[in-house]
């Protein structure tokens, strides 16, 4: 039973990260509606996917160092919430902006928390191996 829980805690943040990164990449497809030409479209895709590239690199690092994923995904969620709050203060507040926070920042927070739980569990297991009872 413990082994199944360990596998679940290990794989869940990684799989959710991949799904979340692909979800964010879908938002860049709106650049094709702009009729920018070939190079303009390439530049637009690159600009829209900068967060995707950053999170993909973070996932790659986090595969072995879970604390990095825990911190960065949590900070990414906080950054998105902060950007949305600034936008809400600048523009007129609209209720749909709050739902965007749940849709984008919520999974980032969840992934960050799962990476931290995985890191803590891994640390606990390493200490148990070093100092047997």
Enumerate the language-model features and the residues they cover.
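Cytosolic juxtamembrane helix and N-cap/initiation of the first transmembrane helix
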Residues: 1-21
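Aromatic-anchored segments of alpha-helical transmembrane domains
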Residues: 20-27, 76-87
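Short juxtamembrane and helix-loop transition motifs at transmembrane-helix boundaries
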Residues: 27-40
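Alpha-helical transmembrane segments of polytopic membrane proteins
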Residues: 42-52, 98-106
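Hydrophobic cores of alpha-helical transmembrane segments in multi-pass inner/ER membrane proteins
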Residues: 51-59, 106-115
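Juxtamembrane helix-break-helix junctions at the cytosolic face
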Residues: 55-69
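Membrane-helix boundary connector in multi-pass membrane proteins
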Residues: 82-101
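Membrane-water interface at the C-terminal end of transmembrane alpha helices
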Residues: 107-132
């Amino acid at each position: 039973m413990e082994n199944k829980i360990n596998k679940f805690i290990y794989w869940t943040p990684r799989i959710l990260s991949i799904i979340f990164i692909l979800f964010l990449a879908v938002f860049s497809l709106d650049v094709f509606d702009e009729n920018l030409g070939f190079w303009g479209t390439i530049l637009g895709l690159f600009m829209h996917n900068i967060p995707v590239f950053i999170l993909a690199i973070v996932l790659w690092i986090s595969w072995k160092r879970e604390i990095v994923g825990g911190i960065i995904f949590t900070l990414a969620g906080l950054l998105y919430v902060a950007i949305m709050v600034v936008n809400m203060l600048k523009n007129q507040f609209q209720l749909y902006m709050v739902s965007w926070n749940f849709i984008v920042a919520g999974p980032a927070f969840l992934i960050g928390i799962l990476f931290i739980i995985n890191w803590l569990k891994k640390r606990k297991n390493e200490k148990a191996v070093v100092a047997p009872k």
